[in-house]
Amino acid sequence: MSGLQLIWKSPTQLVLFVLLITISCIDLCHAVGAATPTKKSPPVRITKPQPVSSTTTAIPTTNEGSTTGEQLALLVSSTTEGTASSASSSSNGGSDDSSSTTAAGSLVPEICITGLQLSFTNADGEQVVRKQQELVQVIEGDVMLSVITSDPVSALFVINRVNQANLISADFEVGIRAINVDNASLAENLLIQEVQYLQQCTQYSMGIFIDFDLYKRLESIIRDLEYNVWPIPSARAHLFPKVAHLLHQMPWGEKIASVEIVTETLDIYNEFMDAARQEHMCLMHFKSDDNVYILFGNKMANHFKENGTVFAVPTERTEHIFLEELPNKSFILMENGIELRTADLDPMPTTLDEVLIGKSVLPSRILVFASPIVDLMNWLRGSLAKHCKRDEDLYMLESCFNFLNFIEDWRTPEYRRTHDTAELLSLLRMRKLSTSMLFQMYQKKQETVDVITGESRMELREIASQNFVTNVTTYYHYNRDNHTSLELKTKFGLVFNCQFTAGENRRYPFLFDGESVMFWRIKLDTWVATGLTAAILGLIATLAILVFIVVRISLGDVFEGNPVTSILLLLSLILVFCSFVPFSMEYVGEQRNSHVTFEDVHTLNTLCGVRVFIMTLVYCFVFSLLLCRAVMLASIGSEGGFLSHVNGYIQAIICVLSVFVQVGMSVQLLVVMHLASESVSCENIYYGRWLWGLLAYDFLLLCSLVSLVPFIYRSQRNYREGILIVIGAVLILIIWSVWIALSMFGDEWRDAAIPLGMQASGWAVLVGILIPRTFLIVRGIERSDIAQALPSLTSLAFAQNNQYSSEQSVYECVNPAMRHCSQEEMNHQSPSEIPTLPLRGGGPRRQQFFANLRQANANINPQRPPPHPQQSPSRSSVCSLPPSPDHSKITRF
């Protein structure tokens, strides 16, 4: 205690000590506060990369082998990396300027500093890194677009024209980042990086356009990105019609030859064949000594024969080395590259961006990219009018808010509008380019060797050209080179002309005289399996019912009504279910546009004719039989029916005449198709509107059957045949409405709807009429067995043990031979409408059995007179119907 008193002897020392403790506490609290992590606001978006100090992390390179999931995860995590690095750098903080500069620089996302990068292994096994300067060409603007394409110059030129024409009427310009893709396998990597760049490094970005083939390749990745990515329409839509037209118009003095089409993908092949179809041009492939090769793409195929003629169609920019590899006298069909010069663009003065000076563009690439861009700019201008203020004639960017919200609507293809070529050239101020937008045909001449230099020179002679805008075809050196007039040569398209192309639906236009390459097979569609299953099950059920009826008839059973009609209806259903076979078969080649011989055409027409003939006849058989039965029921019914009676002969005449009418029309159609096969095509009838004319008579029979529904639905005759026919007719009418509606959606739908509709109609008759009727027949046979097993009403034994005390007869409405009814009931019910039980037939064994039974009952007490039945006193009047005739004389309808 004395020591402490010595320490605080002086007040000055105490004050200094307290001050020292206070300063230490402040420093300690400051250090703790600095070390505690705090949540910082996310970095703001910037429009352009900002310069930072050199103390940055190493440049990350994106490997080609990295997975898509890792790159997509990078998009999620990249926005938080800047914040985390900023916090960690400030924890090591100090008061010097260099540390604060590093912290500020970390707010900029790294991709905004480094740009896009690719790291991949080349053909020599070396690791190659390509930076943004090699990949991306940029036109600066306030609102940015990106394009991933194999032809970036054409995309840059279109955006330059948009800014020069000021389509958006604003005080700012649209910028573009054009990314060159020379390898499709690298497109996925570039797309993911570009989405990340636009999200983090630009303030206003509309989306990304990508080549059509690349879009199809990356469609699943694009859906996962959930970003505005749109396909550029394929340039082949502009090129292939020009190729087909020039081939069709080309003079061709040779005989018909085999044509082999070499393409990189099946889609290219099908698109070109569709274009050739529009020109009525048949390109045939068969075994031949002379071959014509049409080569699509920029890769050379080396299997050409020496006597073959080669037509090369480059789908990208044509390289000189590709032309050198082609055989001499080959024909090259390609579009003309346009050198960009300001004076050649538009009468009004315009300028070009620096990146476009000295470059060339392709007409097809300009047109396919300009159409969606012009439509997008029109939507953007409409959005600016709603969300921006206008100063004189321009919309001010500073006053805009949410002006890019329209993109969600524009990305829907239904809202877009197409523009024709002349309109695009006028809007984008490049009207003078119309004379230079040509698709040309050249012929490679024999290479000559320069005597002085010793170098070989290749000469391309222009044969013809077609303008993209006017579609005018011009011929050049053909007359002089071939020493003959152009008009004296037969055109290529006339030599390879299509046959049997009458009508709007030309399904098989490519015909030739050669060996067939087509074969028979069952269709691979899902509906075929469904239809075959329904047809087999329906056939089994129909045969089972038919066998049952035939067996019961052979046993001597007597049915209500004539069973001949039921048997004919069952035979018609067998035809209905078997008719699915020609609809399930097809005669095809290996490809969609397989070449067809003239014999193949006759086979296809025969198959089509069989389908039409069977379809119309089986419907007619079923509807005619049902109609004649409905007419009979309506003619004898007491509840609103006709008063006359239609007997079996008239029914047969009605049915036969109804069938003969349809047979006559169907046979006439087959004769006409055979005699006029060049002008009448069964395919065009089957897939055209004439089909409804062929089915009009069947539909008339169905409508007549439905019109008799009010007159027959109460009929109880023939196992309640009236209500069963009503159910079947209504089901068939519903089925017809469904399959006719489905067949309107196209040829593929019609292929499935017609046979499935036939099977459904057969099942409607089976389920609605025949199966319930079979059940009633079985139940009636069992009741008949029970009734005939009882003792006879005339036997003495039965008479001795029974007294008639009931007011109503026990056997009333059981058999006409033993029916008692009141006079009042007779006035309200027609005898023809009273339901009866079928009588068992007179088979030998059954007749002997019941005869013995009656004889035994009669011999029990033969000397005792039969008692007289006592009538009930409460019954005022009782009447008996005359005895029923013998079962062998019963009249049925």
From Swiss-Prot:
Residues 773-893 are cytoplasmic. GO terms for molecular function: G protein-coupled receptor activity; sevenless binding. It is a multi-pass membrane protein. Residues 32-530 are extracellular. GO terms for biological process: visual perception. The chain crosses the membrane at residues 531-551, 563-583, 607-627, 630-650, 653-673, 692-712, 722-742, 752-772. Residues 36-66, 82-102, 858-893 are annotated as: Disordered. Its main location: membrane. Keywords: Cell membrane, G-protein coupled receptor, Glycoprotein, Membrane, Receptor, Sensory transduction, Signal, Transducer, Transmembrane, Transmembrane helix, Vision. Residues 1-30 form the signal peptide. Pfam families: 7tm_3. PANTHER family: METABOTROPIC GLUTAMATE RECEPTOR. Belongs to the G-protein coupled receptor 3 family. This is Protein bride of sevenless. The gene is boss.
